[in-house]
Amino acid sequence: MILSIKSVVVFCFIIFTIALFSAAISSCTLNSDKEIVNDSIPEVPWYGWNKYQIKPEDSLVRLGHDLIANTSYYFGPHGTIATITNGMNCQNCHVQAGIIPWGNNFSAVVMSYPSLSSRSGKMQSIAQRINGCFERSLNGKAIDSSSREMQAIIAYMHWIGDDVPHNRKPLGSGIMKLPYLNRAADPARGKIVFMNVCQRCHGKDGEGQLNANASGYTYPPLWGEYSYNTGAGFYRISNVAGYVKNNMPFDEATYLHPKISDEEAWDVAAFIDSQPRPEFNVKNDYPDISKKPIDNPFGPYTDSFSEQQHKYGPFKPIEEAIKKLRKN
Protein backbone atom coordinates (compact mmCIF):
# COMPACT_ATOMS: atom_id res chain seq x y z
CA MET A 1 0.00 0.00 0.00
CA ILE A 2 1.40 3.39 -0.97
CA LEU A 3 0.98 6.15 1.65
CA SER A 4 0.70 9.80 0.75
CA ILE A 5 3.24 12.26 2.13
CA LYS A 6 0.47 13.82 4.23
CA SER A 7 -0.38 10.44 5.78
CA VAL A 8 3.27 9.80 6.63
CA VAL A 9 3.58 13.20 8.32
CA VAL A 10 0.41 12.66 10.35
CA PHE A 11 1.52 9.16 11.37
CA CYS A 12 4.95 10.42 12.51
CA PHE A 13 3.34 13.23 14.49
CA ILE A 14 1.05 10.77 16.29
CA ILE A 15 3.99 8.48 17.16
CA PHE A 16 6.03 11.46 18.44
CA THR A 17 3.13 12.71 20.58
CA ILE A 18 2.56 9.27 22.13
CA ALA A 19 6.27 8.94 22.93
CA LEU A 20 6.40 12.39 24.51
CA PHE A 21 3.28 11.73 26.59
CA SER A 22 4.67 8.37 27.74
CA ALA A 23 7.92 10.01 28.82
CA ALA A 24 6.01 12.57 30.83
CA ILE A 25 4.00 9.85 32.57
CA SER A 26 7.17 7.88 33.27
CA SER A 27 8.84 10.96 34.70
CA CYS A 28 5.91 11.59 37.03
CA THR A 29 5.86 7.94 38.11
CA LEU A 30 9.56 7.97 38.94
CA ASN A 31 9.03 11.04 41.13
CA SER A 32 5.71 9.97 42.65
CA ASP A 33 7.18 9.81 46.16
CA LYS A 34 8.98 13.14 45.88
CA GLU A 35 8.10 16.75 45.38
CA ILE A 36 8.27 17.47 41.65
CA VAL A 37 10.43 20.55 41.16
CA ASN A 38 10.72 22.43 37.87
CA ASP A 39 14.08 24.16 38.07
CA SER A 40 13.26 26.23 35.00
CA ILE A 41 10.65 28.19 36.97
CA PRO A 42 12.36 30.99 38.94
CA GLU A 43 11.53 31.39 42.62
CA VAL A 44 9.07 34.20 43.19
CA PRO A 45 9.55 36.57 46.15
CA TRP A 46 7.27 35.77 49.07
CA TYR A 47 4.17 37.89 49.65
CA GLY A 48 2.01 37.46 52.75
CA TRP A 49 -1.75 37.30 53.01
CA ASN A 50 -3.42 40.67 53.53
CA LYS A 51 -5.79 41.50 56.36
CA TYR A 52 -8.88 41.16 54.16
CA GLN A 53 -8.17 37.44 53.82
CA ILE A 54 -8.50 36.83 57.56
CA LYS A 55 -11.60 34.73 58.10
CA PRO A 56 -14.43 36.23 60.18
CA GLU A 57 -14.05 33.50 62.80
CA ASP A 58 -10.29 34.13 63.20
CA SER A 59 -10.72 36.85 65.80
CA LEU A 60 -7.35 36.16 67.45
CA VAL A 61 -5.51 36.52 64.13
CA ARG A 62 -7.39 39.75 63.42
CA LEU A 63 -6.43 41.12 66.83
CA GLY A 64 -2.81 40.15 66.16
CA HIS A 65 -2.83 42.09 62.91
CA ASP A 66 -4.31 45.13 64.65
CA LEU A 67 -1.73 44.95 67.43
CA ILE A 68 1.05 45.02 64.86
CA ALA A 69 -0.53 47.73 62.71
CA ASN A 70 -1.64 49.91 65.64
CA THR A 71 0.67 48.93 68.50
CA SER A 72 0.70 52.40 70.00
CA TYR A 73 -3.09 52.47 70.33
CA TYR A 74 -2.80 49.56 72.76
CA PHE A 75 0.64 50.06 74.34
CA GLY A 76 1.87 53.58 73.47
CA PRO A 77 2.04 56.72 75.62
CA HIS A 78 -1.78 56.83 75.66
CA GLY A 79 -2.30 53.08 75.31
CA THR A 80 -5.66 51.49 76.07
CA ILE A 81 -4.04 48.41 77.65
CA ALA A 82 -0.77 49.78 79.04
CA THR A 83 1.55 52.74 78.51
CA ILE A 84 4.84 50.94 77.96
CA THR A 85 6.20 51.89 74.49
CA ASN A 86 7.52 54.92 72.61
CA GLY A 87 4.48 55.44 70.38
CA MET A 88 5.79 53.61 67.32
CA ASN A 89 3.90 50.71 65.76
CA CYS A 90 5.41 47.35 64.81
CA GLN A 91 4.20 48.18 61.30
CA ASN A 92 6.51 51.19 61.20
CA CYS A 93 9.40 48.74 60.79
CA HIS A 94 7.53 45.73 59.32
CA VAL A 95 5.91 47.11 56.16
CA GLN A 96 2.14 46.53 55.89
CA ALA A 97 2.18 44.37 59.01
CA GLY A 98 4.98 42.15 57.73
CA ILE A 99 3.74 40.95 54.34
CA ILE A 100 5.99 42.74 51.81
CA PRO A 101 9.11 41.22 50.16
CA TRP A 102 12.28 42.57 51.78
CA GLY A 103 10.08 44.80 53.93
CA ASN A 104 11.28 43.21 57.18
CA ASN A 105 8.44 40.74 56.80
CA PHE A 106 7.35 37.86 59.02
CA SER A 107 7.63 35.06 56.45
CA ALA A 108 10.41 33.18 58.26
CA VAL A 109 9.39 33.80 61.88
CA VAL A 110 7.37 30.65 62.52
CA MET A 111 9.87 28.34 60.85
CA SER A 112 12.79 29.98 62.70
CA TYR A 113 11.67 29.63 66.32
CA PRO A 114 12.47 28.32 68.82
CA SER A 115 16.13 28.82 67.99
CA LEU A 116 19.47 29.58 69.60
CA SER A 117 19.89 33.35 69.76
CA SER A 118 23.43 34.62 69.18
CA ARG A 119 22.46 37.85 70.91
CA SER A 120 21.36 36.23 74.17
CA GLY A 121 23.33 33.01 73.89
CA LYS A 122 20.16 31.10 74.82
CA MET A 123 17.28 29.28 73.18
CA GLN A 124 14.62 31.82 72.28
CA SER A 125 10.89 31.43 71.66
CA ILE A 126 8.75 33.55 69.34
CA ALA A 127 7.32 35.32 72.40
CA GLN A 128 10.81 36.19 73.64
CA ARG A 129 11.77 37.50 70.21
CA ILE A 130 8.64 39.68 70.09
CA ASN A 131 9.38 41.03 73.55
CA GLY A 132 12.88 41.87 72.37
CA CYS A 133 11.25 44.19 69.84
CA PHE A 134 9.06 45.72 72.55
CA GLU A 135 12.14 46.47 74.65
CA ARG A 136 14.46 47.63 71.86
CA SER A 137 12.64 48.85 68.75
CA LEU A 138 9.71 50.21 70.76
CA ASN A 139 12.03 51.28 73.60
CA GLY A 140 9.52 49.87 76.07
CA LYS A 141 8.78 46.99 78.37
CA ALA A 142 8.03 43.35 77.70
CA ILE A 143 4.42 42.18 77.74
CA ASP A 144 3.16 39.05 79.48
CA SER A 145 4.01 36.12 77.21
CA SER A 146 0.81 34.34 78.28
CA SER A 147 -1.41 37.36 77.62
CA ARG A 148 -4.13 37.36 74.98
CA GLU A 149 -2.26 40.10 73.14
CA MET A 150 0.94 38.07 72.86
CA GLN A 151 -1.01 35.00 71.78
CA ALA A 152 -2.78 37.12 69.15
CA ILE A 153 0.50 38.41 67.70
CA ILE A 154 1.86 34.85 67.54
CA ALA A 155 -1.39 33.62 65.96
CA TYR A 156 -1.07 36.28 63.26
CA MET A 157 2.54 35.27 62.56
CA HIS A 158 1.46 31.64 62.26
CA TRP A 159 -1.30 32.67 59.88
CA ILE A 160 1.26 34.60 57.81
CA GLY A 161 4.01 31.98 57.75
CA ASP A 162 2.57 28.51 58.31
CA ASP A 163 3.04 27.62 54.63
CA VAL A 164 6.80 28.26 54.78
CA PRO A 165 8.83 25.01 55.08
CA HIS A 166 10.86 24.61 58.27
CA ASN A 167 14.44 25.90 58.06
CA ARG A 168 13.92 27.24 54.54
CA LYS A 169 13.76 31.01 54.30
CA PRO A 170 11.75 32.10 51.28
CA LEU A 171 13.07 34.57 48.75
CA GLY A 172 12.26 38.06 49.97
CA SER A 173 12.28 37.24 53.69
CA GLY A 174 13.42 39.82 56.20
CA ILE A 175 15.68 42.58 54.85
CA MET A 176 17.85 42.49 51.74
CA LYS A 177 21.59 42.43 52.40
CA LEU A 178 23.20 45.06 50.18
CA PRO A 179 26.77 44.66 48.86
CA TYR A 180 29.35 46.36 51.04
CA LEU A 181 30.81 49.64 49.86
CA ASN A 182 34.54 49.95 49.22
CA ARG A 183 34.56 52.84 51.68
CA ALA A 184 32.97 53.75 54.96
CA ALA A 185 29.34 54.84 54.84
CA ASP A 186 29.29 58.63 55.14
CA PRO A 187 26.81 60.39 57.48
CA ALA A 188 27.51 63.75 55.80
CA ARG A 189 26.52 62.40 52.39
CA GLY A 190 23.63 60.63 54.04
CA LYS A 191 22.30 63.91 55.41
CA ILE A 192 21.91 65.19 51.85
CA VAL A 193 20.00 62.04 50.90
CA PHE A 194 17.82 62.47 53.97
CA MET A 195 17.01 66.07 53.11
CA ASN A 196 16.16 65.22 49.50
CA VAL A 197 14.26 61.98 50.02
CA CYS A 198 13.23 61.37 53.64
CA GLN A 199 12.61 64.74 55.25
CA ARG A 200 9.19 65.38 53.70
CA CYS A 201 7.71 62.49 55.70
CA HIS A 202 10.00 62.11 58.71
CA GLY A 203 10.59 65.81 59.38
CA LYS A 204 13.76 67.88 59.25
CA ASP A 205 14.73 66.72 62.74
CA GLY A 206 13.72 63.10 62.15
CA GLU A 207 10.78 63.52 64.53
CA GLY A 208 8.23 61.72 62.35
CA GLN A 209 4.54 62.55 61.90
CA LEU A 210 1.78 61.53 64.28
CA ASN A 211 -1.49 60.25 62.85
CA ALA A 212 -4.70 62.31 62.93
CA ASN A 213 -5.72 61.35 66.48
CA ALA A 214 -2.13 61.27 67.81
CA SER A 215 -2.47 57.61 68.84
CA GLY A 216 0.60 56.58 66.85
CA TYR A 217 2.92 57.52 64.02
CA THR A 218 2.05 57.52 60.34
CA TYR A 219 5.74 58.20 59.68
CA PRO A 220 7.92 57.13 62.61
CA PRO A 221 10.65 59.16 64.30
CA LEU A 222 14.06 58.08 63.03
CA TRP A 223 15.96 59.37 66.03
CA GLY A 224 15.34 61.15 69.29
CA GLU A 225 13.38 60.30 72.42
CA TYR A 226 10.57 58.41 70.68
CA SER A 227 12.62 56.36 68.24
CA TYR A 228 14.23 52.91 68.52
CA ASN A 229 17.05 52.57 71.01
CA THR A 230 20.69 51.52 70.61
CA GLY A 231 19.83 47.87 71.25
CA ALA A 232 17.49 47.60 68.26
CA GLY A 233 18.30 45.76 65.04
CA PHE A 234 18.00 49.04 63.17
CA TYR A 235 20.97 50.37 65.11
CA ARG A 236 23.01 48.32 62.63
CA ILE A 237 23.39 50.26 59.41
CA SER A 238 23.25 47.18 57.16
CA ASN A 239 19.66 46.63 58.28
CA VAL A 240 18.68 50.26 57.76
CA ALA A 241 20.39 50.37 54.35
CA GLY A 242 18.68 47.22 53.06
CA TYR A 243 15.34 48.38 54.41
CA VAL A 244 15.35 51.90 52.94
CA LYS A 245 16.70 50.72 49.57
CA ASN A 246 13.63 48.60 48.88
CA ASN A 247 10.93 50.43 50.80
CA MET A 248 11.62 54.16 50.97
CA PRO A 249 10.19 56.64 50.19
CA PHE A 250 7.21 54.75 51.52
CA ASP A 251 4.76 55.96 48.88
CA GLU A 252 7.08 55.40 45.93
CA ALA A 253 9.68 52.64 46.30
CA THR A 254 9.39 48.86 46.00
CA TYR A 255 12.03 46.19 45.60
CA LEU A 256 11.20 46.20 41.88
CA HIS A 257 11.43 49.97 41.61
CA PRO A 258 13.83 51.38 44.22
CA LYS A 259 14.26 55.15 44.27
CA ILE A 260 17.77 55.39 45.71
CA SER A 261 21.07 53.67 44.93
CA ASP A 262 22.90 51.21 47.16
CA GLU A 263 25.45 53.90 47.94
CA GLU A 264 22.76 56.39 48.94
CA ALA A 265 21.10 53.73 51.10
CA TRP A 266 24.32 53.05 53.02
CA ASP A 267 25.01 56.76 53.50
CA VAL A 268 21.52 57.68 54.70
CA ALA A 269 21.61 54.69 57.07
CA ALA A 270 24.88 56.01 58.49
CA PHE A 271 23.34 59.46 58.93
CA ILE A 272 20.23 58.10 60.70
CA ASP A 273 22.24 55.92 63.08
CA SER A 274 24.68 58.73 63.82
CA GLN A 275 21.87 60.71 65.44
CA PRO A 276 21.01 60.65 69.19
CA ARG A 277 18.52 58.11 70.48
CA PRO A 278 17.68 56.28 73.74
CA GLU A 279 20.42 54.04 75.06
CA PHE A 280 19.95 50.35 75.82
CA ASN A 281 22.16 48.31 78.12
CA VAL A 282 23.85 45.92 75.69
CA LYS A 283 26.55 44.61 78.06
CA ASN A 284 24.97 41.14 78.13
CA ASP A 285 24.48 40.91 74.36
CA TYR A 286 26.55 38.36 72.43
CA PRO A 287 28.21 36.43 75.27
CA ASP A 288 30.16 34.70 72.49
CA ILE A 289 31.68 37.77 70.84
CA SER A 290 32.63 35.76 67.76
CA LYS A 291 28.90 35.70 66.93
CA LYS A 292 28.57 39.49 66.72
CA PRO A 293 27.34 40.79 63.37
CA ILE A 294 30.00 42.62 61.42
CA ASP A 295 28.27 45.99 61.89
CA ASN A 296 27.51 45.65 65.58
CA PRO A 297 28.81 48.99 66.90
CA PHE A 298 29.71 47.79 70.40
CA GLY A 299 33.01 46.09 71.26
CA PRO A 300 34.80 44.00 72.28
CA TYR A 301 35.44 42.04 69.08
CA THR A 302 37.55 39.06 68.09
CA ASP A 303 39.28 41.28 65.51
CA SER A 304 41.35 44.43 65.96
CA PHE A 305 39.07 46.89 64.16
CA SER A 306 37.55 49.87 65.97
CA GLU A 307 33.94 50.40 67.00
CA GLN A 308 33.87 53.26 64.48
CA GLN A 309 34.76 50.93 61.61
CA HIS A 310 32.38 48.24 62.82
CA LYS A 311 29.60 50.84 62.80
CA TYR A 312 30.23 52.58 59.47
CA GLY A 313 32.71 50.41 57.58
CA PRO A 314 34.50 49.81 55.34
CA PHE A 315 33.35 46.29 56.11
CA LYS A 316 35.28 44.25 53.54
CA PRO A 317 38.57 44.32 55.53
CA ILE A 318 36.68 43.22 58.65
CA GLU A 319 34.99 40.44 56.70
CA GLU A 320 38.35 39.17 55.42
CA ALA A 321 39.89 39.30 58.89
CA ILE A 322 37.00 37.32 60.37
CA LYS A 323 37.33 34.67 57.65
CA LYS A 324 41.02 34.24 58.48
CA LEU A 325 40.28 33.98 62.20
CA ARG A 326 37.71 31.25 61.57
CA LYS A 327 40.17 29.24 59.49
CA ASN A 328 42.72 29.22 62.31
Could you describe each region identified by the protein language model?
Residues M1-K6:
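N-terminal secretory signal peptides that target proteins for export/translocation
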Residues C12-A23:
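Bacterial N-terminal signal peptides
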Residues I41-I81, D162-M195, Q209:
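Electrostatic cytochrome c docking/interface patches
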Residues L63, R129, C133-K169, L256-P287, ...:
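C-terminal capping alpha-helices of c-type cytochrome domains
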Residues G64, G87-A97, I153, G190-Q209, ...:
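The canonical Cys-X-X-Cys-His
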Residues P77-A127, G208-P249:
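Gly/Gly-Pro-rich "capping" loops immediately C-terminal to redox-active cysteine motifs
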